[in-house]
UniProtKB/Swiss-Prot annotation:
Glycosylation sites recorded in the entry for this protein: 135
Signal sequence extent: 1-16
Name recorded for this polypeptide: Lebocin-3
Post-translational modification: O-glycosylation is important for the antibacterial activity of lebocin.
Gene source species: Bombyx mori (Silk moth)
Keywords from the UniProt entry: Antibiotic, Antimicrobial, Glycoprotein, Immunity, Innate immunity, Secreted, Signal
Keyword Hydrolase applies: no
GO biological process terms, semicolon-separated: defense response to bacterium; innate immune response
Tissue expression profile of the protein: Hemolymph. Produced in fat body.
Originating gene: LEB3
Length: 179
């Protein structure tokens, strides 16, 4: 019976590893949520609170200054019987001219390239985005450990000493060239 229990436990471990099952342990707890900050309303009275007091910059009238004026002032004076789609000054940008144009650019190829308005969205071709990368041992690379102790030098003299030792051992002495 003891051999059967040992064999079955080893078999369960191999099966869990082979079937790519990872047992998720609840080790992460999200931080506690903070209560919303409540602020009191400033007592403004009947006066609007401007950011800069005392400057002589003319400001647009507001409804607080003039309660008779409407909340939305129409400075452009557009004709209410005419529909303006994109721009008042450029009649080529209205919706009627956009519907009748083809939106293709011919650059001399076999087929013209469509502009960005008629192009297809690539999210429909690849709805999931990138394929998932396997993370189990036959697929993921083993980590390479690099000694980071000598990466940053504290003093420039250490670099000069190392360069001097390198020149002594691996380079040709300058005395040979002077002869």
């Amino acid at each position: 019976m003891y051999k059967f229990l040992v064999f079955s436990s080893v078999l369960v471990l191999f099966f869990a590893q082979a079937s790519c099952q990872r047992f998720i342990q609840p080790t992460f707890r999200p931080p506690p949520t903070q209560r919303p900050i409540t602020r009191t309303v400033r007592q403004a009275g009947q006066e609007p609170l401007w950011l800069y007091q005392g400057d002589n910059v003319p400001r647009a009238p507001s409804t607080a200054d003039h309660p008779i004026l409407p909340s939305k002032i129409d400075d452009v004076q557009l004709d209410p019987n005419r529909r303006y789609v994109r721009s008042v000054t450029n009649p080529e940008n209205n919706e009627a001219s956009i519907e009748h144009s083809h939106h293709t650019v011919d650059i001399g190829l076999d087929q013209p390239i469509e502009s960005h308005r008629n192009t297809r969205d690539l999210r429909f071709l690849y709805p999931r985005g990138k394929l998932p990368v396997p993370t189990l041992p036959p697929f993921n690379p083993k980590p390479i450990y690099i000694d980071m102790g000598n990466r940053y030098r504290r003093h420039a003299s250490e670099d000069q000493e190392e360069l001097r030792q390198y020149n002594e051992h691996f380079l040709i002495p300058r005395d040979i060239f002077q002869e």
